[in-house]
Amino acid sequence: MHLEDNWINAVLSKFDNDELFREAISIASHSLYQALQKRPLKNPTQVCRSLQNYINRMASRATPFGLFSFVTAGYWDEETRGSLDLTKVYRRARPDMEWIYALVKKFYRENSDFSALLVQSNSLVDLKGDRLFLKYFRFIKDKKIQTPKTISLYANRLVITIFEMAKSRLSIDQLWEKLLEVLPNLNKEKTFEVIKKLLSHQILLPGILPSLLSDSPFKELMKFLPNAVWMNELETKLSDYQSTSLGSGELSLQNLRKSMDAVVPIQSPLHVDASYKGTPIYLSNEILLKLQQAVTFLWKISASRSSQFTSLEAYRKKFIEKFGLHRIVPLKELLSEEKGLGSFLTYPQIDEKSVFDKFSQQWEKCLNKKWQESMLNHQKEIVLTEEWLNSLFELVEEELPDPCKALSSFDLFFKIQAQSIEEINRGNYQLYLSDCTWSGGSTFGRFWDLFNPEIQHELSKLAKAEKHLEKSAKVVEVSYWPSHVRNANVSVHPCLREYSLEIDNKDNSILGLEDLYIGTTHERFYITLKDGKEEILARSGNVLSYIQAPESIRLIREITLSRHLLLYPFYWAGLEEKAVFLPRVRMGLCILSPAKWNLDASSFLKDSLDIIKVKFLAWAEQWKLPDRFLMTEGDQHLLLTSKHPAHLNEIATRLKRGESLQLMEEITSEWLKSESGSHSGEFVVPFIKNSIYPYPENTRTPQAFETVKSRWMLPGSQWMYIKVYLSEEQENNFLLNKFIPFIEHLNEFISINDWFFVRYQDPERHLRFRLRIEDIHYYGLILSWLHPIGIQWMEQGLIKKIMLDSYEREVERYGGEDVMDAVESLFCVDSLAVTGLLKYFEKKEDTLETVCHILSIVSFLNGFGLDLQTKIDVLGNARQDQKLLKGFREYKNQLLKLIPALEDPNQPEEGICSVVNKFAMIRIPAQNQFLSKAQHIENSRLLEIYSHMIHMHCNRLGCDNSQETRLRLFCEHALKCCLKTSHIS
């Protein structure tokens, strides 16, 4: 108890005797500040533990946090130099964004002249039929208020008209006048109540909500508010507070808070940062060189990381399946459950391997080996070299990552571990690379106004240099008010890019969500505009995590990031959270990963706090945990010591709660000094990619968005779409012996012009039949016959169920609306040709299925009159894995004889080539019709269309995706052998 009293008294003494500390606590947690003012304390241990955590956090990391730290800009020079003069540290105070948001809400709620207020539609709202949906809300943190996950409002004609008219900002008075033009009998009072309801549900937003792409959102807001006494008073008190010297601002701060609370009372009305305007700090060019080398090393090993965008990749595969490679889809339509693919966040995390899969496996294997050796030899450090890393790539015969695919820019965080500046200049230092962002300069965005014009100019140059690396794309600054509006403090900065997308300030924004379209290539998604000419890159000049963004913003941010090979901090892969001890990892003078310890909480759950402390100290001694260490959680670091009773209590409490701990060695930084002593410094360097490595030029064919009226064929159109669910084993039997006879029976009474089928799984296995009906009045007759025969099929155990559905024609995939009828006619005759072949296979048990399938593919391509090289090019479009060639030798000789024989008219009538050609002849008229209508399509595009047709042909033959890939590769290789041996001219 005596020890506990000692540390509590020490913490309280610090608070009572240090005005700057009290001021910093008031800014960080005013509720804690108020609790400490009331003596005696109600719960001294709990209150002082909270206070101790702030002290620990201040000593742990130089993260800008109120008055616990400050920011400044430095320079590179021949040697390191500099010291701190704390009299040159200045505050910058501005209204917290949460307070600004609350002020706007109050103004709209209490304004007597409601009709003068500006409003705008919320671009995140979706209109579906007669309902409005909103899934992203802005809120002020309040435990009493529960934020809804989704709002759904009935939208009558008035609501829809209001929503559409307010897509451009206008006053409620102007909105009323426009409404009267189309709805002249409106009641004004009732209409205004509707507008108020839409504002309260965030369907409409206040038109004065300030832009976050600004030096001062508060000044922007003041332009819209009527002049009031409190404004001048607030401006004066802000100025007074900022001008007080450090250590004498507590009273001024409290007066300022009272004034702000009188206007809008919230928990944190003020946002304070500190900046240093003394003599700059200079770091040596040698340090920069070491950082560049370490970054190159880190980027190479980042190739071992599997993609973090695996849900996005699953979404992309579904996009290709539904829309193909030649269609762009409006962003908002894509995210719609009804029109597109729905939310990409609901798609599974697929097991997507790294692009550098061999290296990834080798890296993890070698890292494991080095860890085992370090444990065996009791080593506290592992040293890696560039030569060793390059040898791993050589060992697995993989090329080094392409620097053109690297990020255009990024910020690197690092610390310098050294005893003094003199030691740094002697080369006695180490650099700890702690973190990075994926956009250069983003760390500095929120501090823009704290830098001098020279530094601001350098940051502007960085944005321009980044644009030069992306010559074929528009780089767009994306901005939005986050759901927890206090986080908007991180997002305040001017726009340094030519284009912007502000979803809450459309009048200030060059682009809107409705302007964006999504397409995909074989490798990745891309964002474009309606004309499809230029790619759009969605970037952000701040460090607010895009994970918190509205889904539409998150999607475009992930699409932009997924085009790059990203940079990651060092990661121990499977060992990161499992190994009890991980040694320090170093490359030259750069610490890539400090020593780490993992402590599993499961063995402490039943123990008392006192026993947990004893067990922890024993564990710490066994695993040689230093006296001072960091407890980490994400990017939060807390400096602790095993000798401090409050720290031990914090550790024991967490373990008792079942929280496993990750501990890390402290990287000390004592060389940066002032008259008050040593200071912890964390440095951030923005990097821009070398201009000799621009991002690869976009080779995709521009796709303009087309609204195709004939894309959808609903029940009742000329196409009847029937799905028959059944087991895979029954498919051919049902197709040949049940469904085709059913169609033949129908044709005795009515005219079914054409039909075709596709095999599918979504996830249940089924056959899809599309029937083109001459007279839609036959629909009822067909269904009346389908019902009894369907019941019979179900009773026989042949099928599970039958469904009618809407047929979405894949217009872009097959060359456009002009050729779609010809494509469907070809599908119909191909269905007849394939079913003929399948019947032949049924009778000939000795037929080699693989050979027949390959010959059928070749005969399909022969029908277009393609030469040998063009056939090879079509099959090569599929980008197959060469490993699948295994087994080709078994068929090689037979294929080299049979493929040329397909074009020999003198083949035996019962021979396999004659049989394949017999059914191929059914397709020839339809193929010729397609060619006559497709003359306007360029050759490279035609090859892709042929490839898609081959995919559908293989599907009808009964091949799944892996079988099709293998068939294509065998076929391509056989054709290359034929070309080589001149069997076909």
Task: Please give the residue ranges for each predicted region.
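C-terminal structured domains
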Residues: 427-645, 649, 739-743, 973-985
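Acidic, low-complexity/disordered tracts enriched in E/D and polar residues
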Residues: 52-166, 253-270, 518, 522, ...
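Segments forming glycine/polar-rich beta-alpha architectures that bind adenosine-containing cofactors
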Residues: 117-122, 127-128, 314, 318-326, ...
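Long, contiguous binding/interaction regions
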Residues: 695-766, 770-985
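Extended, charge-rich low-complexity regions and/or helical-solenoid scaffolds
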Residues: 587-763, 775, 801-805, 837-844
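Type-3 copper protein
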Residues: 1-95, 157, 189-486, 524-526, ...
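Short acidic, hydrophobic short linear motifs in intrinsically disordered regions
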Residues: 169-180
